[in-house]
Amino acid sequence: MWQAVRFTACSDDDDIKAPNEIDTSVMSGDYKGKMTSWNIAAHEGEGENGEAEPGVDVSATIENRTVRFEKFPIKDIVLSIVKDENLANQIVEAVGDVNYDIEYVPVLTAAKDSIMMNLNPEPLKLTVTMPAETEGGEAQSLVVEVQVAAGEKKAGYAIENGNLKFYIDVTKVMLGEGEDRQEFTGFVPASLHFDMNQCRISHN
């Protein structure tokens, strides 16, 4: 007799498969959870007072071996560039929702209890409108390219409970385009940790 595989939130009996039927397609569906960030050079996951950062709410969809964000959280990245909380909030509001996809290669473990993910993130590109420095001045548009790499910690999906965890590192920020493109030297590399639970399963 096989043991039922449980998924979080809104899954139902139709979504349950016996272990010998499990494959990487069980990852497909909707996810909700938290994203926390920290400077790579600092203590991982800890704030100045030594407590874990609360993180921000995130949601994503997995389909066709792609983690798809329709509202990727960019405030921490913007804040690291402009160094001003109010200005960062203005820019994030002006940019609006940011779509970002992360492709991956899934590998089902021999025990069929989890799926490892080899992430292949692409650069995140934004067009940021900087408010005018003086009253009556013109706002300036700035092209920002954020270099992203897979984190050192393993990414994976737990089949028993539908929990998804992965890390990506924001390693470099390039400003401008063409001949004017240059690295933003004041940027501090950061690690973004995503911890999400599957709340809907897609049937491919």
Task: Mark where each language-model region is.
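Edge/loop elements at the starts and ends of beta-strands within beta-rich repeat scaffolds
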Residues: 24-28, 157-162
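Bacterial Sec-dependent N-terminal signal peptides
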Residues: 1-32, 198-204
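Short, solvent-exposed loop/hinge segments that bridge or flank secondary-structure elements
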Residues: 33-84, 187
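A short, surface-exposed beta-strand/turn
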Residues: 47-60, 85-111, 186-203
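Generic short beta-strand segments
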Residues: 32-40, 122-129, 165-176
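Predominantly extracellular/secreted and cell-surface proteins with exposed
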Residues: 66-153
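Edge beta-strand at a domain terminus
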Residues: 145-152, 158-204
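Short, ordered beta-strand-loop transition motifs
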Residues: 60-64, 109-112, 158-162
